[in-house]
């Protein structure tokens, strides 16, 4: 628990440096706290980068075309619960990882499957996943971690 708070402080500082001119500090730091607590096996910077690309950390964002909502742009019954939205995003990442492991693919596949669903992954990558990886690498460098590149997605057996 203490580790999550330290992570959230580092991440909040990095988010303010990276996005403080376009997103309110309160929204950035709230997102940092939630991300640090729900990240589990995922790098918090990766979840923050996804949330930034999906909604600019807006917990009330709604995509009328896809029916997704919240900072992580997911579908869940607990609409309006910001923590549940982030947890649903983590669950969606796990599902995407399982799909990509079966295909023998890595991080780009996971991010593409998160963004468009497993059915949307057709071997042709678009700019979205690469942008998320760049955002995550930038946040890692701003949090003061020694390794600046996003860590490889761990594969489950």
Q: Which residues does each PLM region occupy?
A:
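Non-catalytic cell-wall polysaccharide-engagement segments
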Residues: 2-40, 57-58, 75-157
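Flexible, surface-exposed loop regions and adjacent strand-edge segments
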Residues: 66-67
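Conserved alpha-helical segments that form or flank metal/cofactor-binding pockets of metalloenzymes
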Residues: 44-45, 49-63
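Structural recognition of the beta-strand scaffold that forms the well-ordered cores
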Residues: 49, 71-73, 113
């Amino acid at each position: 628990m203490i580790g999550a708070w330290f992570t959230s402080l580092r991440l909040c500082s990095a988010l303010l440096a990276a996005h403080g001119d376009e997103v309110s500090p309160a929204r950035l730091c709230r997102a940092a706290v939630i991300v640090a607590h729900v990240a589990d096996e995922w790098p918090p910077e990766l979840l923050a980068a996804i949330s930034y690309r999906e909604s600019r950390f807006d917990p009330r964002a709604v995509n009328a075309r896809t029916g997704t909502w919240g900072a992580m742009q997911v579908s869940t019954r607990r609409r309006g619960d910001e923590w549940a939205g982030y947890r649903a995003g983590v669950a969606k990442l796990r599902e995407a990882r399982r799909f990509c492991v079966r295909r023998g693919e890595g991080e780009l596949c996971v991010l593409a499957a998160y963004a468009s669903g497993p059915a949307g992954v057709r071997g042709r990558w678009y700019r979205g996943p690469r942008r998320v990886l760049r955002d995550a690498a930038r946040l890692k460098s701003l949090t003061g971690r020694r390794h600046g590149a996003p860590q490889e997605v761990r594969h489950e057996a």
